[in-house]
Regions:
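Accessory RNA-recognition modules of RNA-modification enzymes
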Residues: 1-194, 199-205, 213
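Conserved beta-strand signature within the Rossmann-like core of class I S-adenosyl-L-methionine
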Residues: 216-222, 227
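A short, acidic, flexible beta-alpha connecting loop/helix-capping segment that sits on the rim
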Residues: 224, 248-251
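Short alpha-helix
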Residues: 230-234
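Conserved active-site and SAM-binding loop architecture
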Residues: 237
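Conserved S-adenosyl-L-methionine
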Residues: 241-249
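Conserved small/polar residues in nucleotide/adenosyl-binding loops
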Residues: 254-256
Length: 256
């Protein structure tokens, strides 16, 4: 337990051109021949035995065991796109796009969000801070041709991936920009799913959500303190808290 779960790694390169990790609060690179929290597929590769130029490596391993190595946001080894299978959904994403680092996290999050949201036919759903559309794709299958799911994301690479994957799905609408900029333009929202960064959502976004009066809000958070702060505002505006579920997606770390 707590080992061999991480699918994304940032590695440093030593003076001997070997991959390793930086010592705590130091620029010193400690060479390693394996990483105990990395997926076994990463440790079985030649990443820790090869010689590398430059200073850093980003390693990404998909659920289909594809491995990409990137430097300075450019792929230098492996496929340029990774295939991720989550339940019955398939995603094709760039290693630069955000994806959960725990290999099982996308599936656990998806199952819990879909359970709590209880999406129905013909609903209008917003997926805020939606990344490449982890929640958008399964929602689109539940709402039918008369429903709508609106993915709002500001990251260019995530939006490019989402456009490539969903361009032929007629009930998915992709909005490139901040939630502050785009949420106001979506009408008659039934359900909001949001997965913001650790600092939570802005007052403007909270106010937009309250003004839209969705029946259901599913808040995915990696920071209990900002979740509590934002939930307090919603509770003060006629919403009630029906359920809280904790998922340990960062094993051996303080985060939840």
């Amino acid at each position: 337990k707590g080992l061999h779960w991480r699918s994304r790694l940032n590695l440093a390169i030593s003076e001997n051109k070997k991959a390793g990790l930086r010592a705590h609060k130091s620029n010193t690179v400690i060479e390693i021949d394996k990483c105990m929290i990395a997926l076994n597929e990463i440790n079985k590769s030649d990443i820790f035995t090869k010689n590398w130029d430059n200073e850093n490596l980003k390693i990404s391993c998909s659920s289909t065991n594809e491995i990409n190595v990137s430097q300075f946001e450019k792929s230098i080894l492996g496929p340029d796109k990774l295939t991720e299978n989550v339940d019955k959904n398939t995603y094709t994403i760039s290693p630069k796009s955000f994806w959960q680092s725990h290999i099982n996290a996308p599936g656990l999050l998806l199952q819990q969000v879909m359970k709590e949201a209880n999406i129905q036919q013909d609903e209008i759903v917003c997926d805020l801070y939606g990344g490449v559309g982890l929640f958008t794709l399964p929602v689109s299958k539940l709402i039918g041709k008369n429903g709508q799911v609106h993915l709002i994301e500001m990251n260019d690479t995530c939006i490019e991936d989402a456009n490539n994957m969903f361009e032929h799905i007629e009930n998915i609408y992709i909005h490139h920009g901040t939630v502050e900029q785009k949420l106001g333009g979506v009408k008659n929202i039934d359900t909001i799913i949001l997965d913001p960064p650790r600092n939570g959502v802005s007052k403007q976004v909270i106010n937009h959500m309250i003004e839209k009066k969705p029946n259901t809000i599913i808040y995915v958070s990696c920071n209990p303190s900002t979740l509590a702060r934002d939930s307090k505002v919603l509770l003060e505006n006629k919403y009630s808290l029906s359920n809280i579920v904790g998922l340990d997606l960062f094993l051996s770390l303080i985060h939840i």
